Curated annotation (Swiss-Prot):
The keyword Transport does not apply. PANTHER family: RIBONUCLEASE, RIBONUCLEASE PANCREATIC. Keywords: Disulfide bond, Endonuclease, Glycoprotein, Hydrolase, Lyase, Nuclease, Secreted. The lineage of its organism: Eukaryota, Metazoa, Chordata, Craniata, Vertebrata. It comes from Myocastor coypus (Coypu). Its EC number is 4.6.1.18. Glycans are attached at residue 34. This is Ribonuclease pancreatic.
Length: 128
């Protein structure tokens, strides 16, 4: 079965670079990465950075996770990300998403040995 680390990669990593101006990016990616099976996953973020750079976040700034756990980490630098949000007129199985590109700091939960990201917690605008 899929490990938590592999699930994180499937759901959140797209290192091929930014999707530029493809408005269908989220529709295509959410489907190809199996996040529209059984339901339309409401929100998902893809990170367009090398996997090693995202894994390195586990050794950066320790922050509190949204659920109160203490194993979350915030990236020291901004990363290119794409936020996918299901549209209000979206009707399963025809999941439809709005694609928005951002440059933000990311927050991930890490666990295991090796210590790697297993959950995408948030993206935050970097403080100036």
């Amino acid at each position: 079965s899929e490990s938590s680390a592999k699930k994180f990669e499937r759901q959140h990593m797209d290192s091929r670079g930014s999707p530029s101006t493809n408005p269908n990016y989220c529709n295509e990616m959410m489907k190809s990465r199996n996040m529209t099976q059984g339901r339309c996953k409401p929100v998902n973020t893809f990170v367009h950075e090398p996997l090693a750079d995202v894994q390195a976040v586990c050794f950066q700034k320790n922050v509190l996770c949204k659920n109160g756990q203490t194993n979350c980490y915030q990236s020291n630098s901004n990363m290119h990300i794409t936020d996918c949000r299901v549209t209000s007129n979206s009707d399963y199985p025809n999941c439809s998403y709005r694609t928005s590109q951002e440059e933000k700091s990311i927050v991930v939960a890490c666990e295991g040995n090796p210590y790697v990201p297993v959950h995408f917690d948030a993206s935050v605008a970097a403080s100036a």
